[in-house]
Amino acid sequence: MYNTSFIQIQKGDIFYADLGETVGSEQNGIRPVLVIQNDVGNKYSPTVIITPLTSKAKKLAQPTHVFIGKRFGLTENSYALLEQIRTIDRTRLLEYVGHADIPVMDRVDAALRVSLNLI
């Protein structure tokens, strides 16, 4: 673990994060997350907007799920859950994993628009 309070975080970065305790179907615990916040916010804010990743293949037909795969430093095939976006303090980010490429982030942005009804 290292101090992520002062590192430059970019949209598309993947980290392990401690999402702590949650309620019901919310994603919790230490898990990979994908940064979806814009880089201006990432530069100046003490918080960061993320979407959790999961390796559990459930309800894959949802338009808010994006297959990431076993790439970008991830050790298992992973899916971004864009219906589970949340803001976390950047100190919850534990370890840098990698950075998603542009085609993946384009699919993430499209799923985010669906999730937020911005289409």
What are these regions (language model features)?
Residues 1-119:
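Conserved functional hotspots at enzyme active or ligand-binding sites that engage polyanionic ligands
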